[in-house]
Amino acid sequence: MLRPWLRQSTRAARSLPCCQCPRPYSSRLPTLTSPSSSVRRLQTSASESQDRVPLRKQLKQNAKALKAEKRQRRESEEASRQKWELTVGIEIHAQLNTETKLFSRASTSSTDLPNSNVALFDLAFPGSQPEFQVPTLLPALRAALALNCDIQPVSRFDRKHYFYQDQPAGYQITQYYEPFARNGYVDLFGYDGIAPEDGDHVRIGIKQVQLEQDTAKSQEYHPSTQLLDFNRVSHPLVEIITMPQIHTPATAAACVRKIQAILQSCSAVTTGMELGGLRADVNVSIRQRGDTEGVHQYGGIGGLGQRTEIKNLSSFKAVEDAIIAEKNRQIAVLESGGVVEGETRGWTIGSTETRRLRGKEGEVDYRYMPDPDLPPLLIGADLVSELANTLPTSSDELIGLLTGKEYGLSIEDAKPLVELEDGARLEYYQDVVDILRDLQQDQDPKSRGGLARVAGNWVLHELGGLLTKADLPWDAERVSALSLAQIIDHVQRKQITGPTAKQVLAMVFDGDTRAIPQLLEEENLLLRPLSREEYVALAEAAISQNPQMVEQIRTKNQLGKLGWFVGQMMRMGEKGRVEAPKADAILRELILG
């Protein structure tokens, strides 16, 4: 590495005028002895710096500087938030859970070969006509009802005209003017992940829910090849349009997450963002707080700033990050005296800026018009009533029930019980609680009051931990609800200790098919209480091991150190027979008198 540098320095030295040297210039390499010569000297050893900073001090300085930078950034963001108001509206496109396409009998399977599930109408063959598939309406209605929408008895289909290779007809069939559902809402709570500044509860209005076609799936190959799979053309979609009532990026992401969970809970969709079954577009605008003079109006809300649309966001994090980036961009434009343009922008995962895709096409550019080939869609009140009565209980109601007086679970336990395995674990938990309450009927009502909380801990953390460790999916048959309830029952009756109960659970999890009472008896795991004399003997043996700690407890009242002696007693005693509260009481008696 040094040789090229040396050669370069030598060549440079040859070309220098030797004005300091009294000898005439020679074409040969001169001997450079003057300290004022401009030739660089190669230094092979580090010079001693008198102000060298020790590594530890340097790390502390760097950490302090980073902390100060973060604090300054937070203060800047807070100042910006106080001055500027963010407004966000969301459009969610979700693939419906149907076997056929919206206007043809072709299959909606996503696993078949490309271009193998395509009808003539999907490819816009001349003379082909749309044929509305009635079964596709059912999951759409379930979605709209779960979002608290008013179902319209009459709705109509419109053509949205644009030219792109993924839409062979040159237009998309949608419901722009008369959608089948309007005026819904979604409630967001703290446990949904909304921003702290939004409080404990936010209600976001749903302007409308409409049926529409999906487009073809395209794959680009560098430099100029693009392949199209028309299997996805005319796949039934619902487009869910929220009101522009969101004011923080975190709440926007929480809204998309909550809507996806609602759609999945009512079987309206089969896949979410993680598999491409749901996509989101966000409309972002900025205005000064308190400014009602804005000229723009969206969804009936006026006084807003110029909006930009960010298309095709495919994850919750992308929704939040893209909004943050676009908010910062618009604020920078406005603070520099510029004007925000109405346009469509894109977002790349990992980026810190949105990018311009095209100028925003106005509604008139799409040339919306009623579809002349499709009759009005009539929806009967009896169908709506039947579907409404068969909807599952909402997650918010379930969480409210689980955190209420009857079960007393924390939000941290209630939420995963509702969300995991599409409610399968919640059903298992309910079975465990019901069996356990029956087993504990002869016990004190006060102690029975906490059974639901205890069962929640065992279902989520103990059994769930075994599944996670073994990298296995949920299986309610692996440990039956009866077996788990009997294990908890024995713990509550103090017939086995907590560690023994976990050992028994692991044995059943690993395939032991014996009934719990039989297993405990045959493995000699039942707790046979120690006598007072046995506790005293163990305590005296533990005390003799560390008289210095005993003195600290007596003279300095360091009662926390009693736990060490309790642990020693449990290790010295027969496994599972020493009860910590009783051991602690004996130790206090012997040490403190």
UniProtKB/Swiss-Prot annotation:
Q: What ranges does the record list as Low complexity composition bias?
A: 27-42
Picking any one GO molecular function of the record gives: ATP binding
Q: Which stretches are tagged as biased composition: Basic and acidic residues?
A: 66-80
Which terms under GO biological process does the entry name?
Answer: glutaminyl-tRNAGln biosynthesis via transamidation; mitochondrial translation
* Top EC class, one word: ligase
Q: Where is the transit peptide?
A: 1-49
Q: Which InterPro entries match?
A: Asn/Gln-tRNA_amidoTrfase_suB/E, Asn/Gln-tRNA_Trfase_suB/E_cat, Asn/Gln_amidotransferase, Asn/Gln_tRNA_amidoTrase-B-like, GatB, GatB_Yqey_C_2, Gln-tRNA_amidoTrfase_suB_CS, Gln_synth/guanido_kin_cat_dom
Q: Where is this region: Disordered?
A: 27-80
By sequence similarity, the record places it as follows: Belongs to the GatB/GatE family. GatB subfamily.
For this protein, the record's NCBIfam families field holds: gatB, PRK05477.1-2
According to UniProt, the name of this protein is Glutamyl-tRNA(Gln) amidotransferase subunit B, mitochondrial
Which species?
Aspergillus oryzae (strain ATCC 42149 / RIB 40) (Yellow koji mold)
